Regions:
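Amphipathic alpha-helical coiled-coil/heptad-repeat segments
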Residues: 1-41, 205-259
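Non-catalytic DNA-recognition/assembly elements of restriction-modification systems
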Residues: 47-74, 201, 205-209, 213
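A short beta-sheet element
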Residues: 91-92, 111-174
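Low-complexity, Lys/Gly-biased intrinsically disordered segments
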Residues: 60-101, 115-118, 137
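A short glycine-rich beta-alpha junction/loop motif
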Residues: 132-133, 148-156, 167, 187-213
């Protein structure tokens, strides 16, 4: 069994390294395109953003607040009663690889409590949810469902106005230059924190709307193939971890576990 465990651990580590490389590759593509655009021959100028090179001359350096249709808002600061069924209530754990994973929700809340949450914030398609508290601060996901749900305090909601294409902003918020801004802006207490007003003050490089759409379409296609590869590798890792657990069960109990 020791030899089997070693082999499983080795394969898992190799797969995880591949996943890390794919994620770095994905971020490098996103950063290149949201800061340079799709036209290599365009005139450029100094972006004046720390850690960022020149950008196309006709693009703008804007505050996040200027491209939002509402102020950045986080979820309720109290812990609600959770149930086995009802309205999904999500927190930071549900933000996985740029998407919302409802299987990792915090639990269910009552319709009555969700009505209260809705007075503060009601999720809509194309909203961007950002983790603002804890080890994964800065990670984001886009709302892509009409399903009713709500968010807890570690998440902040960002809603774009008509000047900004939400998909473009979704990618820009994953770029190295934006993540670097967040890292320089968050505060530390018991854990790293990014305030909602701080998010509003961060800078974003904004092309004209038609270019934003073109970039978003390009990155949707490019990132979809990378995400598929990442998902396949993660599936392998999960299967191997479950297999190892079943072997441990067998060692401890002398019985095969049905998985």
């Amino acid at each position: 069994y020791d030899e089997k465990f070693r082999k499983i651990d080795t394969i898992v580590q190799k797969q995880q390294k591949i996943i890390e490389k794919l994620m770095v590759y994905k971020q490098s593509i996103i950063t290149e395109i949201v800061t340079k655009g799709l036209n290599p021959n365009v005139e450029i100028y100094d972006s004046e953003i720390q850690g960022m090179d020149n950008i196309p001359k006709h693009w703008e350096n804007r505050k996040m607040l200027s491209i939002l249709s509402m102020r950045v808002v986080d979820g309720p600061h109290e812990s609600p009663e959770l149930f086995d069924e009802g309205i999904p209530y999500i927190s930071a754990n549900a933000i996985v690889n740029g998407r919302i994973d409802f299987t990792k929700m915090r639990g269910y809340i009552s319709e009555k409590y969700c009505d209260v949450c809705d007075q503060r914030y009601t999720p809509r398609k194309k909203d961007i949810l950002m983790i603002k508290l804890g080890a994964t601060t800065g990670q984001i996901a886009m709302v892509e469902t009409d399903r009713r749900f709500n968010i807890w305090v570690p998440l902040a909601a960002i809603r774009c106005n008509d000047e900004a294409d939400a998909r473009f902003v979704y990618y820009a918020l994953q770029s190295r230059y934006f993540i670097r801004q967040m890292e320089l802006s968050w505060t530390y207490g018991t854990q790293q924190t990014l305030g909602v007003k701080t998010i509003e003050r961060l800078r974003i490089i904004l092309p004209p709307k038609n270019e934003q759409r073109e970039i978003a379409v390009f990155l949707d296609k490019k990132c979809a193939s990378i995400d598929t590869a990442i998902d396949k590798k993660q599936e392998i890792v999960e299967k191997l971890i479950n297999y190892k657990k079943s072997l441990i069960y067998e060692v401890v109990t002398g019985k095969k576990e049905v998985i």
